[in-house]
Amino acid sequence: MARWLSQFFIKAMGVAVASAFAMSVSVAQEAKELRVGLLATLSGPAAIFGEHMRDGFMLAVAQSNGALGGLATNVLVVDDKLDPEHAVKQVTKLIDENGVDVLVGVNFSRVMLAVHDPVVRSKTLFIGTNSGPAPIAGGKCNRYFFSTASQDDQVHETMGRYASLKGYQQVVTIAPDYEAARDAVSAFRRHFKGQIARELFPRLGQTDFAEEFNQIAEIEPDAIYAFMPGGMGVELVKQFHTSGLKGIVPFLSSNTINAITLPITSEMGEGLFSASHWAPNLDNPANKRFVREFSRKYKYAPSVYAAQGYDAAKLIHFALELTGGVKEQEALISAISAAPFESVRGDFRFNSNQFPIQDFYLVEGVRRTSRLYEMEAIARVFDDVGDAYAGSCRM
């Protein structure tokens, strides 16, 4: 009996030691590296948006000493060239050849709509850091996709609500003549209770807005709402400044006045309004550290695109600290769902469609010094709000 017990304990100890060794090998192998694919627009006129997003993400990686969640982190940065077909080829390579554990990024909706399905079909965890098209927030939502940005309509809805809160009755809208811009105007109308005096849709690429401003002057609206991204927006702001309307007709906008265009428009963008879920003056410790260290490292002021990239890396970091690795994907998805991190925007949690529930602000272009202009949050317009499409999401 004693001999049998002795042999039993020897065998049990052997199994325990072997199991412990196997577990330690498994953990060691898993902990070796985290592979992240970062897809951004990094060439052409829109490259600055991707650069901000990339730099924000990489700052958070640097703050973790190159090891998100304690895992040595290899970030594979890929330029989507704002080309949906090229982007699909790149994400396929990142998944099939590079074996990335997580994909992050995407600046523009037409790229996001192209890459979303192949990524989630592969069951690769995907964290969007800017684009949030309605289908992905609604009927095509997927448990493998999260967003640290917002749903695309929300900034336009914020300006519509603000216009109503101000009591504006007559608003002229101006946006380029393409589908996404018309969608932006529709989103503005969703929360604006007054009347649209006129919708102006200049052709895409137009740079002379004299006729549009003549029409606005004749109508004498309570406000202008502009959705005019990129170079068109810069020209619109410059010509608004010289039109004689500045200081008379309030200029409300989305994706027109921001941290990227304001250094170009400088005093011409001062005093003009936009909407955002983030601004450099949001008063919380995480944001103060982000703004300070981003400016110090990159020698330029961060934008919302940088903030969204930064939050994505922080989200991954703290989720991995909970799970200890990426091997158990279900555990990692659950950890990310809990949003266990301090966002630069303050209050942050995920909705049922895995897009954020967050605050939205009226932001204004302000002058800090003779050469420094930045966006400043001056009023909260929405408090802890989700998007209009979450109810259509079925996971």
Predicted region positions:
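Segments of small-molecule ligand-sensing domains
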Residues: 296-306, 317-375
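Extracellular/periplasmic periplasmic-binding protein-like sensory domains
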Residues: 237-310, 321-323, 327, 369, ...
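Beta-alpha junction/loop-to-helix N-cap segments that form part of ligand/metal-binding clefts
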Residues: 33, 48-53, 63-136, 148, ...
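Extracellular/periplasmic Venus flytrap/periplasmic-binding protein
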Residues: 89, 134-135, 142-242, 280-289
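Extracytoplasmic "Venus flytrap"
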Residues: 33, 37-56, 78-85, 107, ...
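Venus flytrap/periplasmic-binding-protein-like
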Residues: 80, 127, 131-134, 204-205, ...
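Short, low-complexity disordered leader/linker segments with a strong preference
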Residues: 1-35, 394-395
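Periplasmic-binding protein-like
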Residues: 94, 98-107, 127-129, 172-175, ...
